[in-house]
Amino acid sequence: MSATLTARQLAAGHGNVELFSGLDLVVAPGDVIGLVGPNGAGKSTLLRMLAGIDLPERGTVSLSPPTATVGYLPQERDRRGGETVREVLARRTGVAAAQRALDAASVALERGERGADDAYAVALERWLGLGAADLDERADAVTAELGLTVELDRPVAALSGGQAARAGLASLLLSRYDVLLLDEPTNDLDLVGLAMLEDFVLARRAGTVLVSHDRRFLERTVDRVLELDLPQHKVNLYGGGYAGYLAERETQRRHARLEYEEYAETRAGLEARARAQRAWADKGVRNVRRNLASEPDRSIRAYRVESSQKQAAKARQTDKMIERLEVVEEPRREWELRMQVAAAPRSGAVVAVLRGAVVRRGPFTLGPVDLQIDWADRVAITGANGSGKSTLLAAMLGRIALDEGTASLGPGVVVGEIDQARALFVGGEPLLDAFATVSGLLPADARTLLAKFGLRADHVLRAAGTLSPGERTRAALALLQAAGVNLLVLDEPTNHLDLPAIEQLEQALDSYAGTLLLVTHDRHMLEVVHTTRHLEVNAGTVTDLG
């Protein structure tokens, strides 16, 4: 079904903070709109409003035709207990809800309830439109194409991380919503999955709104960009795709800064002139009063009085010019992380060694691996989901026991790590206390550092486990700045970070002088971060590509 979603004058806030207002958006068939903005700007909030899950503080959201389907597919951090892969696919494609509605309509039809015929027709049309009739057949084909070889009746809780990522992508590829809303669909996808997702989005004839931190994905898919500019409290819609958005935004910001600087310079000049004119007027008045009695010439006395009055009039005239100036507000500068990785003393020449290392986990086997990481190696590690990248890191760091072989870290190695699960800050202890304990900082210093990473009072006093993955990632990055490291291990560090933070992280990695192990599927990061070695992991086999 061809459908158009329209938002008019939407407004939303969080507590006393307004996120956005006056937001207008039309999502027509074939549109692919990228939604960008810093963490906390309201991107997920807006998607939930467009989906009809949350109500806006002001404004309306309408759908034409009203019977069209809208699919909101967020990232699901936790797997639902007892739910099978097949049930996940049915739920996230909307088929499960459509089946329940069709079953209820069938019962009403059998009972001969008033309006049951029309209700059944609507329910059946929705069931068919969402692809329920052939979901099982399509699910078998899509999961096979993705390499998800598990039985679809297997509980999702039993899946590996790579398998769970493939199941999530399968639910997206199987969806047939009339309007699709995607919240960070690229998280946890490998390069093959990213390519399949790009093809899916580009082939859709229905409208799509998506949030993503993957710059290559945005460049290749979106035709418009809606920016939630939190620092300026503005909503901006740009045409020309993601590249056009970046260019136009830079031009706008440059013009806004120049316009403000011109206004500020003009105002400062007028204010200086007014001060000088008032000073001359005041000086003239004092001189007139002092010399008036001693000056016998009446015309000279009149001239001096008139001169001081003219200076006062000029000052008033300049004040009016200042009042008539059209005020230009100073553009607010974006929050900048300005991160640096604190350096520890250099380690020994050999940083990490695996000799004949084998790790077995059920049917999966990593190795045998023979590998040596030397001081100042900058290693990119790539491979498909489930190929063993995270297992390789854990083996090198001694986080897991080997079934065969040996693993060792060299002398003087100090590890700084961001793991894929963001498991460092997950307990019930307040973030501030947990961070101070791990970092060794005093609470006041820990609070200051966390604030630099966008984690303020309402974050640091909450239980660490209640923070979002993005907030936990920021806390982990702050820890890297607090504690000196000489072996930096990053497993999918861009997941859950916004674009400004990712760019700051890339700059920090560029200046980092120690040893680096980087696992990422972010194609832009792989291009801009300097690496000296490339390890490829494929089904448990590690190949050093040099």
Regions found by a protein language model. Give the residues of each.
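Flexible nucleotide-interacting loop at or near the entrance of a catalytic core
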Residues: 115-141, 258-364
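ABC ATP-binding cassette signature C-motif
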Residues: 1-258, 342-546
